[in-house]
């Protein structure tokens, strides 16, 4: 499967401000993967980030409990995690 060069996202650009953006897909190495996100949890820290209470660098795409399908994966990552392209996974935030 050929992957697109960009991905659409709603990006937090400041307190209470989102902007639609096409972002370049990152290159992956042997130890990383690219996830086609289907859903993502929004928790208290995301709300604080949106409100401007949690001071984090912007721009940023909120959400850090993603669920999706592996679109591309490096060989070492595939062996270490026991997953492959096409597998549906939920990502632990400590691993992201």
Give the ranges of each region predicted by the language model.
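Short glycine/threonine/proline-enriched tight-turn/helix- or strand-capping micro-motif at secondary-structure
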Residues: 16-24
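Short cysteine clusters
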Residues: 43
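Short structural boundary motif marking the start of a folded domain
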Residues: 3-10
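Glycine-rich beta-strand-centered segment in the early N-terminal region that forms part
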Residues: 24-40, 50-96
